[in-house]
Every structure is written in C-alpha cells, then in structure tokens.
Amino acid sequence: FPKPVLGKIDSMVNKKSKYRHVKIGSKTYYFYRLEWVDITGDAGHASVEEFDKFECSKMITHAYIYKKTSKFVWTFASYEEKDVSFSDRNIFPVGCIVKMERILL
C-alpha cells in the first residue's frame, strides 16, 4: 500500500480560490476588470478633421460577474447577503467587451 501523505486530503477539500470573490446564498461570484467600448455622441458641428478623430470611449468597469452567455455579460457591484439582492447592475453585449480579467486576491 502507498504511504498516506499527511495534509493532502485537507488541502484538496479546503482549497481556497486565489481570485477575489463573494459567496451569496449558495453561489460564488468572481470579481473582474472589464475593458469595453462605448458609443460617443456629439450633436455639434465638426470639420472633416475633427470627425476623422472621433472615436468610441474606452471604458473600464470593476464588478462581480452575475452570469455570462454567448451574447451578454451581467454584472453587479453591490449586494445584500441577507435578502440576496443585487445593486449597481449592468448588462454588456459581448461584442462591446475588449478584455475580461479575473482579479487576484
């Protein structure tokens, strides 16, 4: 029989995530840094040169990921553990997201 390795079973059972997260109810949500592109609008007059320099806004959001599908990403930044409710919510079309990075502890 192989010799048992002390502590090996405990470390497997109690393995902690190296990523920032919260547990709400029975579900774990991970904290992300999202880089995304937003529309930029201007109702004023512009020259050709000004119009050619017109770009989308490059945005950064820090939030917990509620859920993801192939089309959308739902996020929240505030929550209440007792009533399992979420605030500061957003939904992003996946096509607007440039980068998603899970935040380390």
Segments the model singles out, each with a brief description of its role:
Residues 1-11:
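N-terminal amphipathic/basic-hydrophobic helices that include classical n-h-c signal peptides
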Residues 9, 13-105:
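Conserved RNA-binding domains used in RNP assembly and mRNA/RNA metabolism
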